[in-house]
Amino acid sequence: MSLLTNYEGLRHQIERLVRENEELKKLVRLIRENHELKSAIKTQAGGLGISGFTSGLGEATAGLSSRQNNGVFLPPSPAVANERVLEEVGIMALAPLAEMLTSLQPSATPGSLMSPLTGTLSTLLSGPAPTSQSSPLTSFLTSPIAGPLTGTLASSLGLPSTGTLTPSSLVAGPVAMSQSSPLIAPVMGTVAVSLSSPLLSSTATPPGVSQNLLANPMSNLVLPEAPRLRLAEPLRGGPTGPQSPACVVPTATTKVPLSTEPPQSTQDPEPLSMAFAGAPLQTSTPIGAMGTPAPKTAFSFNTSDTQAQPSAAQEQVVPASVPTSPTTSPTVTVLASAPALAPQVATSYTPSSTTHIAQGAPHPPSRMHNSPTQNLPVPHCPPHNAHSPPRTSSSPASVNDSRGPRTTEPSTKSMMEVERKLAHRKTSKFPENPRESKQLAWERLVGEIAFQLDRRILSSIFPERVRLYGFTVSNIPEKIIQASLNPSDHKLDEKLCQRLTQRYVSVMNRLQSLGYNGRVHPALTEQLVNAYGILRERPELAASEGGPYTVDFLQRVVVETVHPGMLADALLLLSCLSQLAHDDGKPMFIW
């Protein structure tokens, strides 16, 4: 009798489970319809340019379909929280039934009373063993909705979460997240970062967001992008050393003749510039031409003072093979070469080109010279003929192919002062070609427009930061996350994060109304800066035509300078800069 009673009770439980299963399936259909409806609404809202910000606690990512075109998310509706509560309650209600069915299964006999649902539920709810997808409840629990259910159940029971944090997992409960993430590990207590936040989206990114963000955005926070720097900034106070190729500004230089004769310097109409493709020079006492060849160095050198004295005739002669370390003095120590070295160096004079010094075959070790060379001062004698033939040298010297024993580092301040003095003397003694000077100045104005636009966008979002090293328009979302972290406990300051994000969205909405595309124009600004350079002195000092820069004047500069294929985008950048300057009431060029 007791066995029949148990069977009867079990049959009622199974029937109740079947009814609950039907109700759960209806709930799943409603949830799916709700998700599809929200996805459609978000897609339409993204097409209309509607933006918002969400920083909800425990928000789960809804997949690619929930992202808007501009990468900004709408806040979740209250129905989402109710759905999670229902899902959690449904799983908690099935747990005791699974335990009872597991305990009764060995003593039960096969019959019509034992529905296949019992075994399925017992297997499904008793452990992580793989189950068949044919059961309706199994398919429900293994559907995309089941991802948050598992994490929610573990969190509600107070169990520690040992799995890694992925974009599809739900951050809920006290601490239910992976401790291996560099950003999420400090986020404790009630603070939980939503992985569907617009700051971490990877596919439909907001305007200005880099397109190479990975699917797991946590790993992208430690991948800084190459910053854009002014060429003169390392001379103001930064450490000296090899310059990055990203900072090289294309300039016009002079082919420097290299021979055994002290040449009279050739006149170069281009302004002073120095762009290193390798490493700087090293000043040392020559030991002689060694048999071991030094590394090849290719650099462009442009002098601003073009006269030379007989005692200082070797100023512009550059060694064919020089050690790569910083110099000591403002001027470059030049070593006269042996006659065999003359064919190894390009000596033709070609304006607007770079001087490539190639190292030829090394001299035999037996040829050793001990004649000292001196560090030559900047010449101050009257100018000579710009293209007169070189005269014969009377002091032999040798090429230093190895590192000298004495090296010191230059003072960045003295280097910058010498550079300014040389540029001033050149403009006063040797007037440049007006047409070439105007073209070079206008090209730098175009690059300055692009640079100032990026600087204005960044300063609008991070006004409290004086230095923006490493900040670009493309990595603004990552920098917002970094700026929102508390340096003491590394917790996310949600209020600060929301305030910075609102500034970012506001600036991008203003620029989008002018035609600015956050996925196209940040890269274009970098291209313009690298192609045309930037101003090398304060804008008020570099202003031409008797007054400050105006929009009309800058439009004429852009039209006459930029290639026709990029002209429309360059004019758009100028209009965006003018609009931002009008909004904050500051000059267009902020130094």
Curated annotation (Swiss-Prot):
Residues 1-42 form a coiled coil. Detected only in testis. Its main location: cytoplasm. Residues 1-78 are annotated as: Necessary for targeting centrosomes. Keywords: Coiled coil, Cytoplasm, Cytoskeleton. It is found in: Cytoplasm; Cytoplasm, Cytoskeleton, Microtubule organizing center, Centrosome. Found in a complex with CDC20, CDC27 and TUBG1. Interacts with CDC20. This is Speriolin. It comes from Homo sapiens (Human).
